[in-house]
Every structure is written in C-alpha cells, then in structure tokens.
Regions:
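Auxiliary tRNA-acceptor-end handling modules of aminoacyl-tRNA synthetases
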Residues: 52-73, 85, 89, 94-104, ...
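Short beta-strand-centered segment that lines the nucleotide-binding/catalytic pocket of NTP-utilizing
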Residues: 318-336
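Conserved NTP phosphate-binding and transfer environment spanning the P-loop NTPase/kinase superfamily
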Residues: 290, 412-557
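Hydrophobic anchor at the beta1->P-loop junction of P-loop NTPases
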Residues: 295-297
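Hydrophobic positions on the alpha1 helix immediately C-terminal to the Walker A/P-loop
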Residues: 308, 312
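Conserved nucleotide-sensing/catalytic segment adjacent to the nucleotide-binding pocket
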Residues: 333, 337-379
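Conserved lysine of the Walker
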Residues: 305
Length: 557
C-alpha cells in the first residue's frame, strides 16, 4: 500500500513528507537555517509542540528560543529539569516540597523544604545532575490523563498544590509531562527533550537559590546574576502576606472561595487593609523627613500608579502635609520637537520627549519658595499652554509627581537628592498556579490593562495584546533599570484580583477571532483564567487599586 504523503509549505517553499512524520523530524531538516534552536511550530497558524505528527497538507512556521514564546518554553523546560534534578539528588523521602516562587533578575527564585541543608555543595550537585540529563538528551514525553487520575497521581506524589488545583478544572483531561519515570504538570508548551536545555546556572540566594536562564535576545548566553534586593524583599513580604492567610496558590484561593467557612468579603478587606497600612507607612516615612519635597512615583504599565498616588496623598494629609499633584506629561516638548520612533511616530516614552530643563527650572523655583505658573500640555494641539495655573510651596506643601522617568535622576538632575523621595510601584503577583508553575507579573498587568482599556478607551483586547510587546520594551528601557534606585517599593497586586478580573477579561478575550495573530495569546490567557473560581466585584472597596481597572471607584481618574 502506497504511503500517504502531505504537502508542507515552509519558508516559502513546498516539500512533501509521509503521514505520521513528526514536526520535530521536519524541524531537524531546517534547523541549520535558523540561528537558534527550534522549539515549537505554528501549523496553519495554530501553535503546536514538535512531538505532534503530520496529518494533512499544511503551512509551517517554526518558533525558536530567540522569540518570547520560545524563550518561555525553554524556561518551562529548565524548571522541569530542575525539579527532577532536586528529587534525583536528594530522594523523595527527604523532600517535603520544591517550590518555584517568582522571577528575580533573569531567573526564578526557588526553595526546597525538607530534611536537608541547602548549601553550595548541594546546589552544585543539583546543577551537575541537570547537566547530566541535558547531555543525555532524554525525551520529554506527554500523555493525557483524566483529571480525576491527575488528582490521585499528585496526591500520591505529595504535590498538594497540584492536587488542589485540578479539583477545580472543568476540562476532563490534563496533559502530564515525564522525563523517564518522573511525572509533573506544566502550564504551557514544552521542549521535546532535555538536550535543548543547555544554558542555566544556579546561585544561592537568601533562603533558597535562583536558577538563572538566558533571555530571548541572547538565548545562548546566561546573564550574570545581579541581585535585586529591594524588589526581592517586596516580593518576599507579599508572599508572607499570602502565607499568613494560607493562600499561596490558585488552588488554595479556590478552596478559600468555595469552602464552607469561606468569606470572600473578609479576604478582600484584609488584603485592602494590608495595602492601606503599607501606604500609611510610606506617608509616615515621608512626613518624618521634612527635607523631602518631591515624591516621585514610577512603575510599569497598569501598576495602579494613579490610584496609588491619590491614596498616598490622602495619607500624607493625615500625616499633616499638603500634597499637590504634578503631571510630568505637562512638560512634553511641543509635538514638532518630539523625537520620532522607528515607525516615524512621535515617541512620547523617551526622556528626550520631555523638556527636562524647564521641568528642573520650575521645580527648583518651587523649592526656593517662589510662585510659578505651571504648564498644561494640550494633546489635541500638540503644544504646551499656560492657563493661569500658579503654585507656591509652603512649609507643609509637598509635590506628588507621577511619570515613566521619575526614578531616573536624569529627569531631576538639578534637584538635590535630599529633597527627593522615590517610589517604585508594580503589580508583583504573589500567587502561584502551583508548586512548579509561577504566574508572570506581566500576565496580571496585561489582564488589568485589557479590562481598563476596553472599558475606558474602547480599545479591544486584540489591540491591547498587539501593542503589549512595544509597551514591554519601553518598560525595559525606561523603568526597570532604575527600580532598585527607589527609596520604597510598593506592590499593588492583590491576592484575589485575578478571580475578580476573570469575569471582565473572559468576554473580551473570547471576542478575538481564530484567524487573528493575537488569538494564541488570547487562548493562553483564557486557559490561565480558567484555573480561577470567580469572585464577584461587589465587595471590592471603591478606593481599591483594582477599581482603576474594573471601574466604579471613588477617584476621578
């Protein structure tokens, strides 16, 4: 019987392959054309793992580790390799839990609970075991099991967080990955084998360690580990807040929401009270130093900067100060003088788009007690205007300034350091999906932004997803390099928020058509939100940072 052949379009050329050929085999024939390892493939626009088999005529587009989704797949593989190496090195009997917590620098912070002493010698053994498995190029197999079987499997393995998670899955089956006999669950796509996982380095850090990995820009280079101690402290502090409530993972949150003694309202109010306490402490710290006249607030997109600045201003008043907001946007250069980006559009995100000298001139005069007229930028005309907005600072007056570049000293180069108080704010998700699957803070911020932009700007989820990578690049250039220069960091993420945002985000994500380039990302986010049992928004306080995104807040934003 003649073997069935299928026509495959790749890189503008057509080639025939027998039915049942894996995409991994096809990728092998084309790998030398690509500068980085091929790890995934789009089949007629649908993202697939390389282990899948050819079943019909199709067009293929390969994905490498040099792309964002390929890099995430690589990191997922390293995480799996790491967890197996820990169990191989120590044995199951000595381990209570291996946990991958959150992102630190270019890697993940991890801890091991159990009968062990984590030191450099043990870490070296774990890393050596990881390299051994990578050198052997062991297959990473995938099998689909019934959800009930997965629950029982992870109960047997002592992976309690996964057991809890799957009790709330509405799908009937779950994909399980294995290296030899070691099985685990990972949210997202996986590399075909351990041979792809060549680049990683383990560093002792705090009570655990960091597994450092390459980024998409340089997928064969392990960046040196640069501790971010302030950011790490905030993340750890936020995680302790979840631990105090017994909520570390999505499964634990779902248990809390659905349990017989559950009171979601109490959870919301406790979380909000914890944030208010932190804001009050920041205000007291500022008020305790009379030299501080400029409160400079910066953070990435959808961090809740506006609501935070309003709530901080209220607490500053409680502390006896009189806060005045100033928008850095009012110091944009006239549009004719605005630098252009690569597409020839005005680039309002770069520092050069601002009249930095005028900004410093005005703030220095205010610091000296002089009365000045502040500008207002008219976005319709593209020009600065003066509309009679005068200001003069008294002894108790203080400026609250919010803007992308507020942590960058180049923005306030003429202002004395002793007069500045810098605050970095971000939504640093403290919740994990389970022990081995972290939630990227960028996902939380993207969902926040989609919900807000759909509600306030008429921007579709498709448009928000399409522009997100550009937003991220701006953050990488203008915000993240300066975050450790902040005097204080504030985490605006709330343990419960994704369970509330779910009801707002799902309808707009379902509106993205399958033939859109943004469909794969929408599909991924929908799968992610499906892990959560929803919480109604009726108990979210009107001054909550979350109200900046879902609406019905008390601030005029």
């Amino acid at each position: 019987m003649e073997q069935q052949m299928y026509k495959v379009q790749i890189d503008g050329e057509e080639k025939s392959f027998p039915a049942g050929t894996t995409y991994l085999q096809i990728a092998g024939e084309y790998q030398e054309r690509y500068p980085h390892d091929i790890v995934l493939v789009y089949v007629n626009g649908k993202l697939q793992e390389l282990g899948k088999k050819l079943k019909k005529d199709c067009a293929l587009h390969f994905v490498t580790t040099g792309e964002t989704i390929g890099n995430l797949t690589y990191r997922r593989g390293v995480s799996f390799l790491l967890v197996k190496a820990v169990y191989d090195t120590l044995g199951h009997d000595k381990i209570e839990q291996v946990r991958i917590h959150f992102s630190v620098d270019k890697g993940y912070y991890c801890t091991i609970k159990g009968d062990l002493k984590l030191d450099q010698e043990l870490l070296a053994r774990i890393e050596e075991r990881m390299h051994e498995m990578a050198d052997k190029d062991l297959s990473i197999r995938k099998r689909s099991v019934h959800t009930d079987e997965a629950v029982e499997m992870f109960r047997k393995y002592g992976m309690k967080d996964k057991e809890r998670l799957f009790r709330y899955r509405r799908v009937s089956t779950v994909n399980i990955y294995s290296i030899n006999e070691f099985e685990d669950y990972y949210y997202g796509y996986m590399v075909p084998s351990t041979g792809y996982l060549k680049y990683f380095k383990l560093y002792l850090y705090d009570e655990g360690f960091v597994v450092q990995m390459p980024e998409a820009a340089e997928p064969e280079k392990i960046p040196p580990f640069q501790p971010q101690n302030k950011l790490f402290h905030v993340l750890k502090e936020s995680t302790r807040g979840g631990d105090m409530l017994g909520i570390e993972t999505v499964g634990a949150l779902n248990d809390y929401v659905t349990g017989g003694n559950a009171n979601p309202k109490e959870l919301l109010l406790v979380q909000e009270a914890m944030q208010e306490k932190k804001i009050a402490q920041i205000a007291e710290q500022i008020a305790g130093n009379p030299q501080k006249k400029f409160v400079l607030i910066a953070g990435p997109s959808s961090s809740g900067k506006t609501t935070f600045s309003r709530r901080l201003s209220i607490q500053l008043r409680v502390s006896g100060l009189v806060p005045h907001p100033i928008s850095v946007d009012d110091y944009f250069k006239n549009r004719v003088d605005t630098p252009l980006d690569a597409e020839g559009k005005p680039n309002y995100e770069c520092l050069e788009a601002l009249d930095v000298e005028l900004f410093n001139h005005d703030l220095k005069k205010l610091l000296a007690g002089e009365r000045i007229e502040l500008p207002t930028f008219n976005f319709k005309t593209g020009k600065r205007e003066y509309n009679g907005h005068y200001m003069q600072l008294g002894e108790q007056d203080i400026l609250v300034i919010e803007g992308i570049h507020c942590l960058n000293d180049a923005l306030t180069h003429d202002l004395p350091k002793e007069n500045k108080f810098k605050i970095y704010i971000s939504a640093l998700t403290q919740l994990n999906i389970d022990e081995h699957n972290r939630i990227a803070s960028t996902d939380g911020r993207l969902i926040r932004r989609m919900v807000r932009d759909s509600r306030t700007r008429g921007t579709s989820a498709k448009q928000t997803i399409a522009m997100w990578q550009s937003v991220r690049r701006g953050e990488e250039n203008n915000i993240f390099p300066y975050q450790e220069d902040a005097d204080v960091m504030f985490n605006s993420a709330l343990l419960y928020e994704l369970a509330v945002l779910k009801a707002y985000a799902e309808p707009i994500l379902f509106g993205i058509e399958k033939d859109c380039a943004e469909y794969q990302e929408a599909k991924r986010l929908l799968k992610f939100l499906d892990y959560f049992v929803g919480i109604g928004s009726e108990y979210v306080p009107q001054n909550s940072i979350l109200r900046e995104f879902i609406g019905d807040g008390c601030f005029d934003l």
